[in-house]
């Protein structure tokens, strides 16, 4: 037994089955980072994981289920990273915080774009992926991302640091603008999209700045 196989079987929690399943998901995720989803075969995954082809079917119904598990896990990690990167309401300045929010959203879209892009060649798997991340039990898609940004805006509004504008609209503007910048960046249009983030935030801030009372 090779060291790699032994490590996968033994794991850290003493459960060989769980450890091997995790090893298969890790392997699939690594392959997805290097190749298009429609080029990955069951044999490719098995060879990379150093197991026989049939082992995959002890844990997953088929190759698509394994790839879907890896894709959803990766996207879950991206959403969780977004949540940890957002600033605490009331800290620093609103201008600086919104720039951090925009930057975090841009990074999320930039990392997620290749995932969704690779799935365009596999419509059935794309449909399953979208259903999984928007499931009612554990929404990980646009709703959770939007709710996270809305919560930050509302918290700043309660502190009087942002005007009482529609927080959902503010979140939509930030999410939509950063997604567009990532998309146009992949098309190679215009200057570096990251350089355009400050202008997006400045425009939003002008609409959200608290109105000063006239004396």
Spans of model-derived segments:
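Hydrophobic/aromatic residues within well-ordered alpha-helical segments
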Residues: 20, 63, 70, 74-75, ...
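C-terminal peripheral helix-coil segments that are non-catalytic and often amphipathic
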Residues: 1-8, 100, 107, 143, ...
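Short amphipathic alpha-helical elements of helix-turn-helix/winged-helix folds
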Residues: 27-31, 69, 104, 177
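Amphipathic alpha-helical packing segments from all-alpha helical-bundle domains
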Residues: 96, 110, 114-118, 126-159, ...
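Amphipathic alpha-helical linker/stalk segments
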Residues: 72-101
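Helix-turn-helix
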Residues: 23, 31-65, 69, 73
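Amphipathic alpha-helical segments that line or abut small-molecule/effector binding pockets
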Residues: 26, 92-117, 168, 172, ...
């Amino acid at each position: 037994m090779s060291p790699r196989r032994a490590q996968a079987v033994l794991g850290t929690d003493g459960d060989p089955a769980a450890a091997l399943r995790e090893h298969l998901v890790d392997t699939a995720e690594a392959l997805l980072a290097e190749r298009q989803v429609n080029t990955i075969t069951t044999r490719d995954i098995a060879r990379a994981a150093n197991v026989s082809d049939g082992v995959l079917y002890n844990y997953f119904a088929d190759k698509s289920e394994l790839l879907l598990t890896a894709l959803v896990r990766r996207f879950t990690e991206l959403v969780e990273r977004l949540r940890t990167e957002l600033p605490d309401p009331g800290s620093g300045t609103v201008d600086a915080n919104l720039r951090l929010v925009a930057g975090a959203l841009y990074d999320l879209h930039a990392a997620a774009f290749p995932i969704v892009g690779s799935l365009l060649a596999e419509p059935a798997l794309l449909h399953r992926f979208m259903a999984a991340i928007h499931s009612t039990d554990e929404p990980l898609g646009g709703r959770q991302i939007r709710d996270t940004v809305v919560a930050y805006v509302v918290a700043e509004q309660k502190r009087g640091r942002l005007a009482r504008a529609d927080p959902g609209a503010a979140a939509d503007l930030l999410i939509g603008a950063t997604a567009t910048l990532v998309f146009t960046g992949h098309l190679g249009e215009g200057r570096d999209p990251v350089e355009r983030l400050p202008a997006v935030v400045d425009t939003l801030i002008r609409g959200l700045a608290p109105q000063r009372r006239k004396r």
